[in-house]
């Protein structure tokens, strides 16, 4: 069985770093850098076992086609944007995702990544995420309640089982900027109707009692009676005095599941948009493919 990259399946990480970059050098340089980073990561994982460190290197559509010779990741495409500009695209070539229980270890691994990739990439965005109180979003609502739990369940949702892409996963990242002043002008009841859950105790509001535009309704989708699940690795980010919000990060064996949620959220299916757009907005968006660790090392 192909080995999955170590940052896809962990649960309850306390800190993460996401780095998005474009390729500057040759594809062969990127191949070598990816292997070098994987070796460095293994050293850190052995040195800090209690940190439960994991990381992922993933590639945008054009870069993956160049690396793989056009083989595999058939669903992969550039992030097109949705909602007539409400969800903008900022597609880049490479995504590096580092997560663990320790920010200091994450930072050291990020430094190692910069050393490994060097001049063959140009960093376009680097975001440091943190686990907030009771795994809540900065809005005060618990985040990721429906996230699959347990390694096997998460593997079933996030990891491609067989074929040329076995052990791989599709990745979506999207940075949201919150306007908490706008949120706090709303009553708690209105906030709960917007999200579809109670704020304090995180109880789901019955479907016939919450609006069609509630966040829960927009993303709780089914096809042929089966839920379109994703594995989320999202975390809050930002500063108290400046920009802050949620860095949304999802892994799935099918890009289809992710895209259907986005189409629903941004009104591209029935014209109804996610009500949480009243206080927050996405400012980035990119699709990537994370090959298995075996394939990453064999590029």
Tell me the role of every PLM-derived stretch:
Residues 1-299:
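Long, histidine/aromatic-enriched segments associated with O2/redox biology
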């Amino acid at each position: 069985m192909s080995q999955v990259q170590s940052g896809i399946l962990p649960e309850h990480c306390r800190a993460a770093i996401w780095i998005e970059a474009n390729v500057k050098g040759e594809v062969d340089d990127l191949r070598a850098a990816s292997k070098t980073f994987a070796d460095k990561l293994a050293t850190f994982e052995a040195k800090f076992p209690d940190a439960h460190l994991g990381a992922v290197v993933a590639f945008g559509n054009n870069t993956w086609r160049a690396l793989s010779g056009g083989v595999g990741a058939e669903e992969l495409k550039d992030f097109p944007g949705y909602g007539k500009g409400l969800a903008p695209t900022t597609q880049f070539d490479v995504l590096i995702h580092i997560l663990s229980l320790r920010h200091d270890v994450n930072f050291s691994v990020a430094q190692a990544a910069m050393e490994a990739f060097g001049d063959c990439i140009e960093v376009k965005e680097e975001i440091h995420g943190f686990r907030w109180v009771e795994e809540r979003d900065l809005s005060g609502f618990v985040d990721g309640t429906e996230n699959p739990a347990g390694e096997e369940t998460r593997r079933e949702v996030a990891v491609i089982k067989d074929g040329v892409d076995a052990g791989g996963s599709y990745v979506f990242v999207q940075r949201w900027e919150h306007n908490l002043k706008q949120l706090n002008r709303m009553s708690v009841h209105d906030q709960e109707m917007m999200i579809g859950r109670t704020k304090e105790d995180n109880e789901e509001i019955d479907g016939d009692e919450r609006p069609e535009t509630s966040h829960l309704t927009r993303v709780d989708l089914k096809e042929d009676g089966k839920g379109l699940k994703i594995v989320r690795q999202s975390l809050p980010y930002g500063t108290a005095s400046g920009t802050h919000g949620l860095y949304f990060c999802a892994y799935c064996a099918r890009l289809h599941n992710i895209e259907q949620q986005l189409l629903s959220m941004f009104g591209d299916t029935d014209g109804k948009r996610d009500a949480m757009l009243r206080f927050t907005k996405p400012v980035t968006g990119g699709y990537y493919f994370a090959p298995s660790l075996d394939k990453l090392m064999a590029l």
